[in-house]
């Protein structure tokens, strides 16, 4: 059941900036007026967050290594965390990888089946992204069928093979631990990696065919961890128009020059830079080289990152919040959300103006999270 409410007294972040005019919702949409009055003085109402890439849901599916929960129950728990952090639309980034375990094809099937089973019972709008390892050429047919069967609308291409070590005939770092963690013999794991590495010459031709097939089906495509302008240009030629977490300013600038969307990690902003020496998200924001921020592995970072960028003067609040709302919605082609304009989905979050803690989250006009004084006022 959707709410019919008229919020008064709060600061409201609309497309033109903050104001104190009332905000009404009804029928799952932002409306021009009407609804039961709710005084939210002392709070700020912001567009609901759109998380364009996050794998933080994984820990709800396996709280401890090897301790798999019921997938559906785990996704319900993940939604609770999303809602508590003001996220109204979330893209679950699921691997389809030779790495096995929670990144393997079998687990990807379980996640998609679990999502299909609980989606109708959730308030947060959940979408799936498939992270495809380009080296798995022999799986491309199965991957295309998987994408079609599960109606996946967003695919990102990755390559996590340690090519430098494999080319030099060295044993990749941490190989034994990684293999044992997924129940695979380390020597067989190494042999598989070597076989995939040796078959990389097959990737360009096969990837061209796969990307063309996905493009015809209307699938949005992106690449992960671009390191150079050349790499970004190559991905653009294949129709992968999203640069997800480019590792260098050069790659990001190439994306901007080519009209591609740039996604960076919100934890990178919260930390003040990359944890592994890659491009700094705050610097990229200052240069105008970010279209959307993603939670990556930490859902609370989205809200914190937007406020940090505004506090640092790199954006005003409207510009900073755009990176976690309208920006990612636009990249995903979700034109019905991301701002608090009449006619848009009633996706919003309410934060305490003093502490900036989330007090309420509403997705599609339905409450997904409610706490404290805001709860007392809405219920009352």
What are these regions (language model features)?
Residues 97-226:
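Metal-coordinating catalytic core of metallo-dependent amide/deamination hydrolases
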Residues 130-141, 225-229, 234, 242-244, ...:
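Active-site glycine- and acidic-residue-rich loops that bind
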């Amino acid at each position: 059941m959707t709410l019919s409410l008229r919020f008064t007294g709060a600061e409201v972040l609309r497309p033109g900036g903050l104001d104190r005019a009332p905000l009404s919702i009804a029928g799952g949409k932002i409306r021009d007026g009407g609804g039961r009055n709710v005084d939210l003085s002392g709070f700020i109402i912001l567009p609901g967050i759109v998380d364009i890439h996050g794998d933080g849901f994984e820990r709800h599916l396996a709280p401890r290594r090897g301790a798999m929960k019921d997938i559906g129950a785990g996704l319900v728990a993940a939604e609770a965390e999303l809602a508590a952090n003001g996220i109204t639309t979330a893209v679950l980034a699921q691997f389809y990888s030779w790495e096995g375990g929670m990144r393997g094809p079998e687990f990807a099937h379980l996640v998609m089946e679990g999502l299909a089973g609980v989606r109708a019972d959730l308030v947060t709008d959940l979408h799936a992204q498939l992270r495809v390892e380009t080296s798995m050429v022999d799986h491309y047919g199965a991957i295309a069928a998987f994408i079609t069967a599960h109606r996946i609308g967003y695919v990102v291409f990755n390559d996590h093979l340690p090519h430098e070590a494999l080319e030099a005939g060295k044993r990749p770092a941490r190989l034994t631990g990684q293999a044992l963690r997924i129940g695979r013999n380390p020597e067989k794991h190494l042999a598989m990696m070597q076989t995939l590495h040796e078959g990389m010459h097959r990737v360009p031709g096969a990837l061209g065919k796969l990307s063309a097939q996905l493009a015809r089906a209307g699938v949005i495509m992106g690449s992960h961890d671009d390191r150079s302008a050349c790499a970004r240009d190559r991905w653009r030629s294949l129709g992968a128009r999203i640069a997800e977490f480019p590792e260098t300013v050069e790659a990001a600038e190439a994306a901007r020059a080519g009209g591609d969307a740039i996604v960076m990690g919100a934890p990178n902003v919260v930390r003040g830079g990359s944890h592994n020496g890659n491009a700094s998200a705050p610097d990229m924001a200052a240069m105008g080289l970010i279209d959307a921020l993603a939670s990556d592995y930490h859902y609370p970072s989205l809200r914190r990152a937007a406020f940090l960028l505004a506090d640092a003067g790199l954006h005003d609040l409207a510009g900073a919040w755009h990176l976690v709302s309208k920006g990612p919605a636009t990249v995903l082609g979700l034109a019905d959300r991301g701002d608090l304009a009449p006619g848009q989905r009633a996706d919003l979050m309410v934060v305490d103006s003093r502490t900036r803690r989330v007090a309420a989250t509403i997705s599609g006009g339905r409450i997904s999270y409610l706490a404290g004084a805001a709860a007392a006022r809405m219920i009352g």
